[in-house]
Swiss-Prot record:
Location within or outside the cell: Cytoplasm
Enzyme class: lyase
Record key words, sorted: Cytoplasm, Lipid A biosynthesis, Lipid biosynthesis, Lipid metabolism, Lyase
Annotated protein name in UniProt: 3-hydroxyacyl-[acyl-carrier-protein] dehydratase FabZ
UniProt catalytic activity: a (3R)-hydroxyacyl-[ACP] = a (2E)-enoyl-[ACP] + H2O
GO molecular function, one term: (3R)-hydroxyacyl-[acyl-carrier-protein] dehydratase activity
EC assignment: 4.2.1.59
Domain of life: Bacteria
Length: 145
């Protein structure tokens, strides 16, 4: 897959930094409409130290955060939103279907379905090897940083 935005370019779009930046690269992008990101899940992730030491599973809340960050890339890379921040304002219909473990490549897909003023909504799914790991509906609030 071709890289549209690499790790350093993502850091120019969203304000997240290590250890909380959860997208490694963007492979598909339509400004304000859609974004597909990838996260290589490593056994060295700090959250695996406690979740769980003998049975490493990526916390579901971090999968949803990775999806929210992917949606933020779709919304914040426009000229009108440059320098702004996307806050996670809500999550609905969230379901976890597959565990995400070290060695997995997490594909993060977000489609923005509605933007009204500073509020955006989107549908999101995370997959591993084509299998659904998580799906949800996200709500974002855009504001000045």
């Amino acid at each position: 897959m071709e890289t549209i935005f690499d790790y350093n370019q993502i850091k120019q779009i969203i304000p997240h930094r290590q250890p909380f930046l959860l997208i490694d690269r963007v492979v598909e992008y339509e400004e304000g409409k859609r974004c597909v990101g990838l996260k290589q899940v490593s056994g060295n992730e700090p959250f695996f130290q406690g979740h769980f030491p003998d049975y490493a599973v990526m916390p579901g809340v971090l999968i949803t955060e990775a999806l929210a960050q992917t949606g933020a890339v779709a919304m914040l890379n426009s000229e009108e939103n440059k320098g702004k921040i996307a806050l996670f304002a809500g999550i609905d219909k969230c379901r976890f279907k597959k565990q995400v473990t070290p060695g997995d490549t997490l594909m993060l897909e977000v489609e923005i379905t509605k933007i009204k003023g500073p509020i955006g909504k989107g549908t999101a799914k995370a997959t591993v090897d084509g299998q659904l790991a998580c799906s949800c509906e996200l709500t974002f609030a855009i504001q000045n940083a």
